[in-house]
């Protein structure tokens, strides 16, 4: 894994950035929760309760994290769990041949699943914002080549789910 910080959503916030940063913090927390569920086999109710009571907006290792938009966090995690049997085959198709979803790192699976869910279901968020946010999250955990793969897969899904919004290549 990359040596970069896994703490991208901290520090001073301007008032007009607050909503975006609360959503960014919710996305990061959702990816971490999905990762925990994948690796540890934790159940959704336990993970949601743990993150909502101990992580969202808390001080962790001496760093104060922005409060996350809890409803947005819950929607992403619950939506991915609910729709995973639909999301995973779409991701398998979008990934390069020979690299099925189960073969890539668990953190990348979590990033791609959350991004795919948001692109398909959260039409209130512009597709370019979704792609950019999840690429930024991937940067916190993996090397540059892998973030390029995240960008390529999510761009492909954005064109599939939101062709009218994305326009021509």
From Swiss-Prot:
One of its GO terms (molecular function) is RNA binding. Keywords: RNA-binding, Transcription, Transcription antitermination, Transcription regulation. GO terms for cellular component: cytosol. Residues 1-20 are annotated as: Disordered. InterPro entries: NusB-like_sf (IPR035926), NusB_fam (IPR011605), NusB_RsmB_TIM44 (IPR006027). It holds the Pfam family NusB. One of its GO terms (biological process) is DNA-templated transcription termination. Belongs to the NusB family. Involved in transcription antitermination. Required for transcription of ribosomal RNA (rRNA) genes. Binds specifically to the boxA antiterminator sequence of the ribosomal RNA (rrn) operons. This is Transcription antitermination protein NusB. It comes from Bradyrhizobium sp. (strain BTAi1 / ATCC BAA-1182).
């Amino acid at each position: 894994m990359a040596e970069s910080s896994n703490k991208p959503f901290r520090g001073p916030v301007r008032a007009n950035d607050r909503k975006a940063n609360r959503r960014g913090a919710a996305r990061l927390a959702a990816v971490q929760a999905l990762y925990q569920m994948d690796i540890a086999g934790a159940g959704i109710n336990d993970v949601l309760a743990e993150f909502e009571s101990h992580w969202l907006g808390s001080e962790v290792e001496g760093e104060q994290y922005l409060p996350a938009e809890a409803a947005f966090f819950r929607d992403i995690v619950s939506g991915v769990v609910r729709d995973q049997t639909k999301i995973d085959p779409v991701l398998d198709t979008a990934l390069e041949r020979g690299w099925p979803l189960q073969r890539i790192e668990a953190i990348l699976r979590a990033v791609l699943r959350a991004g795919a869910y948001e692109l398909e279901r959260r039409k209130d968020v512009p597709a370019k914002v979704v792609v950019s946010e999840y690429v930024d999250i991937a940067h916190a955990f993996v090397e540059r080549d892998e973030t390029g793969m995240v960008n390529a897969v999510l761009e492909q899904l954005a064109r599939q789910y939101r062709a009218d919004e994305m326009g021509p290549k």
